[in-house]
Amino acid sequence: MSYALLRPFLFNMDPEHAHEMTLSLLDKAHKARVLGLVYGQSMQPTDCMGLQFSNPVGLAAGLDKNGDYIDALAELGFGFIEVGTVTPKPQAGNDRPRLFRLKQADAIINRMGFNNEGVDYLIENVQRCKYKGNIGINIGKNAATPVEKAADDYVYCLERVYPHASYITVNISSPNTANLRDLQSGEALTHLLDAIKNRHSQLATEYGFYVPLVLKVAPDLDPIQVDYISQQLLDFEIDGLIATNTTLSRVGVEDLPDGDQAGGLSGRPVSHISTQILQQFSDQLDGKVALIGVGGIDSGAKAVKKIEAGADMVQLYSGLIYKGPGLVQSCIQSIGGYYDAMEN
């Protein structure tokens, strides 16, 4: 069954239940060995952060928080999969309802709150999966951990996931964990990156191999914050930046049903602001830090916009919900066409 036929059925369901059902159906299709026949794998080889990717279009964190569906999702043609956000201990997240579709705007508001089964559960799934491509693991802090002790949670997760991840993303930009975004500014960011990078260097020595470290930031940053974060990335030799997470802005959706719900807004309305922030970081970092563009990509053309703004690779999430799995191939082909045109 095509996604276009399935979507009306899914969109009549509770969003979180529909999310769970979609992943379950995807897993069944994977086990029946039909996914690869439908979607296949487009090649657009990409080197980034010292890693080789089959193509530059990845799955953003949040869709498969616990790594339960890595093999099934990989068959949609992604060049890499990012799982999480995962925390040291399992946690239920915020109360339901916590996920809202804004259909008129092709947007989603979520206040999930890092619901996950804990880092050890995720590691078991990563070890069990058969996918041979790059897997990023996105780490966060437990809601019960005071922000002053956040570094302890991040370092704990870093230690646990290090030997199992292709790269590790430090998520300090979710708006749904109290005070988490405070870690993006001033001494809090410096203290966090210092603790993480010190342990990261030790782990590289202990294991004898290097796992790239990535920071994920919000789109709700002013130029001073962009400048400061950029300098911290350079000072601590962070390998990559994911720009961006969801926004607290409600511009363009404030009058829609559920447009005033608390949480982070993703989808089409965040496209412009996230691309602007990406461009600002690109200007500041001048190719010294790998950039992954995410936010509002619902077409191949939007993916190319991220590349034009300085992204080395892109990630999808909300666009998949509205456009379906065919979006992956569309983005790969559009990016490939863009690079071909640049060479000619």
Curated annotation (Swiss-Prot):
Its EC number is 1.3.5.2. The keyword Transport does not apply. Substrate binds at K65, N110, R111, M112, G113, F114, N171, N176, N245, T246. GO terms for cellular component: cytoplasm; plasma membrane. Binds 1 FMN per subunit. It catalyses: (S)-dihydroorotate + a quinone = orotate + a quinol. Pfam families: DHO_dh (PF01180). PANTHER family: DIHYDROOROTATE DEHYDROGENASE (QUINONE), MITOCHONDRIAL, DIHYDROOROTATE DEHYDROGENASE (QUINONE), MITOCHONDRIAL-RELATED. This is Dihydroorotate dehydrogenase (quinone). It comes from Psychrobacter cryohalolentis (strain ATCC BAA-1226 / DSM 17306 / VKM B-2378 / K5).
